[in-house]
Amino acid sequence: FDYPMAEGVKKTFRRLYTTNLAKAVSFTLGIEDYTEVLEEFKLIAGDIAKEYGLYPSLQNNDEYKAKEWEIASAKYGDEFSHLQDRAEKLAESETDRATYQAMEALIHNLNTMNSRAGAQNPFSSINYGTDTSPEGRMVIKNVMLAEEHGLGNGETPIFPIHIFKVKEGVNYNPGDP
């Protein structure tokens, strides 16, 4: 469950980072319509991805930001790296919130869905716990938080059944990531 969901989290972070960076640059330089700046940063991101195989990410984003700075600092000035940092922090926060909302929706939908007979909820379970990427860990954290929060009005969700996988070298021993 966590591996495929992490791919969606990566895409969300990339989109939010680029959008937030375009907004930050627009606000700083007094550009009223940020869509042109956004399109420019989308092109820059595409060029960096093609040439270097780098993307904005929750982990080790420094190399991507350095390449982006090389391209954009001439046009946007030395304060550009500060704007990158702000956009990164905001994108991480917004990605975390979007991930929580997605997990909340999953739990809500699984507990309000009826079977074809209309009398029961379909049995569902999810397996997670071995993805050590920041995106995978964000998925795991937020699915557990959404489960803990419940369905509202004090109602505890019955589904999905959570199966947390334990693996040596991943999450079994105290020193594992």
Feature-to-residue mapping (PLM):
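Conserved catalytic cores of very large enzyme subunits
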Residues: 1-177
